[in-house]
Every structure is written in C-alpha cells, then in structure tokens.
Regions:
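Short amphipathic, positively biased membrane-proximal segments
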Residues: 1-327
Length: 327
C-alpha cells in the first residue's frame, strides 16, 4: 500500500536527519518496560522465557495494530485521502523510532575518530555501545575489527529488519520486529542466567532476521564498487563463509561486508570471562581504523537499498493485476 511505502521512505530519511533523543527514546522505553516484566516473570525456565517473549513482542505488535486502527478511525469521516496521509505519517514516525542506522554510523565513526587520533582509551570506552566484547584486551586492530563486524550485523538488525517487516506487516511488523530484536539483545545471549529463559527470544530473533540478513548480504555485495570492492568477490566470500559463523544470520552479513571491503573478519572474541574462537571470514587484510569509515559507507548504501526494496514490496498489493492474475 502506498501509505506504508511512503511512510517507510520518510522514516528512513528522518533517521538520517533527526538524532535519537538522549532520554525517552521509544526503544529505550520498551527496554525498561521489558526489564521490569523480566523481574516479574523470571525463572530459569524455557516456558517462562517463552511467556516473557510472547507478552513483550505481542504487546509491541498490538500497539502497532492499535495505532493503525486509531489513525484510520480518526480520519474516517474526512475521506480515504486523509486516512492514507495519516497512515503514512504514523508509519514514518514508527519507522524513525525503529531504525538505528544513523546512531550506528555515529558511534562507529566516533570510534574511528578516536583510533585515528591515537586515543585508544576513548575507542575502548565507546566500543561497548556497539558490542559486548571486552575492550580492555583489544588493541587498535581488534577494536577496528569489532566495530566493522558490529556495523555489518547491526545494519541488518537495526535497519534492514525493521524495513522488511514494516513492508510486509505495516505498523505491527515494525514494532513487533524491533521488540523481538531488543529482547534478543537483552536476554538472548549465552549466559548462566539466560541459557533457558532467553532461548525463545534468541530463536524468535533468528527466525525474524532470516530474510533481512540475506537481503543485507545481497545489497552489500551489490554496493561493493562504492567502497572499492568487487561484487563477484563479495558474493564468493558470502557463499563460502556465510555459514561458518555461530549465528545463522550474522555470518551472512559479516561475510558479505568482509568480501565487499576485501577484509578478513572473525577470530577470537572475549566477552567478559567467556572466550569464543570463531572461523575467519574473508580473504583480505585485517581491518584498520580507516576501514571503519568504509564499512559505514557500505552500510549507508545498504540502508538506502533496503528502503527502496521495502517501499517497492509495500506498494505491490496496490498494483493492478495483469490478465491471468499476475501483477
């Protein structure tokens, strides 16, 4: 439908133009509410975790559905055009709230600034804003790799995913997806506390990100020439290395970025007391500070491509059918 299509494009533009507020951002408000719900429901149980996930994501999706219905009712007597415009405006606002591409770029570029100025302590201080690795054990190249990998993964999670689900399901899809992704960040990681309770959130996020992660990888491969890369090499690396990552989705994104940027990602990661040894992705050199900016440029190209794809998908139901039932 064109109101959804227009709203997705407008929301993506707003994400670039309007900085996220320091306090009161809708995603942060949801996270606080989910944390309180966790305190009430927590038990080291898969069933309790599934209930927690269903309530939190269901509430967010329900709010999206309720907002859409309220907008249509409010514009009812004024005609179809007013209702469509109101739906587009509501979708734009929800898209802006759900997207995190501009914030991701700003955080990554701030780390690049710190590394390029020789301020390793500042780069370490900022890294936890992007990922959960222990920055105290990372040198400049380790921080550069962690940042590039986070840009690749979060481009799918924070931009492409919301746009895809917004195109498919409108406001409920936008808000429900962002809720699922937020819960995964909160309780979906491996730890003694969340091994069972977080299983449902982690699995839901895997399912919800299956299509967005693969679209992210394809768009990154297509945009490789914009950062001096080769689409053919990016596709080859993605096909060869995308399944080597522990995550069924993040591996696709990181492998595509590695191939497009001609870098080598992966290796040993430390998360507090836990150490993971991951296979290497790509066949180029190890990332440096300047490669963070290249990764951000690639992510911005992917963001734009995803917005265009989402807008096209959203408008498909409104296209006239061709003879034989085809559009």
């Amino acid at each position: 439908m064109w109101p959804t299509s227009a709203g997705l494009i407008a929301g993506a533009v707003l994400d670039r133009l309007i900085p996220d507020p320091r306090r009161g951002h809708p995603v942060a408000v949801f996270g606080s509410a989910a944390a309180r719900l966790e305190q009430v429901l927590y038990r080291p149980s898969r069933a309790r975790g599934a209930l927690f996930t269903a309530l939190a994501v269901g509430t967010a999706a329900g709010l999206g559905a309720g907002l859409g219905a309220a907008v249509e009712r409010a514009a009812g007597p004024t005609g179809r055009a007013a209702a469509a415009s109101a739906t587009a405006a509501a979708t734009a606002g929800a898209t802006w709230a759900a997207l995190g591409g501009a914030m991701l770029a700003r955080e990554a570029e701030a780390i690049a600034d710190a590394l390029e100025s020789g301020d390793l302590d500042e780069a370490r201080r900022r890294l936890p804003g992007l990922c959960g690795r222990d920055p105290s054990v990372l040198d400049e190249k380790g921080i550069a790799r962690a940042t590039v990998e986070s840009v690749a993964e979060n481009t799918s999670d924070a931009v492409v995913g919301p746009l895809v689900w917004g195109a498919l399901l409108g406001l409920p899809g936008l808000l429900g997806y962002r809720a699922a992704n937020t819960l995964d960040a909160m309780v979906g990681h491996r730890s003694e506390r969340y091994e069972r309770f977080g299983a449902a959130s982690a699995r839901l996020d895997d399912v919800a990100n299956w299509a967005p992660s693969r679209l992210t990888a394809l768009l990154a491969c297509a945009a490789a020439p914009l950062v001096g890369g080769s689409p053919r090499r990016a596709l080859r690396v993605t096909a060869r290395d995308g399944d080597r990552h522990p995550s069924p989705n993040s591996g696709r994104c990181e492998a595509a970025f590695a191939g497009a940027l001609d870098l080598r990602l992966g290796g040993t990661n430390r998360y507090g007391d836990r150490v993971e040894h991951r296979p290497e992705l790509g066949e180029g050199r190890h990332p440096e500070a300047a490669d963070i900016r290249r990764a951000v440029a690639l992510a911005r190209a992917v963001d734009a491509g995803a917005a265009a794809v989402a807008a096209a998908v959203a408008v498909l139901p409104a296209l006239p059918a061709l003879p034989g039932g085809r559009r």
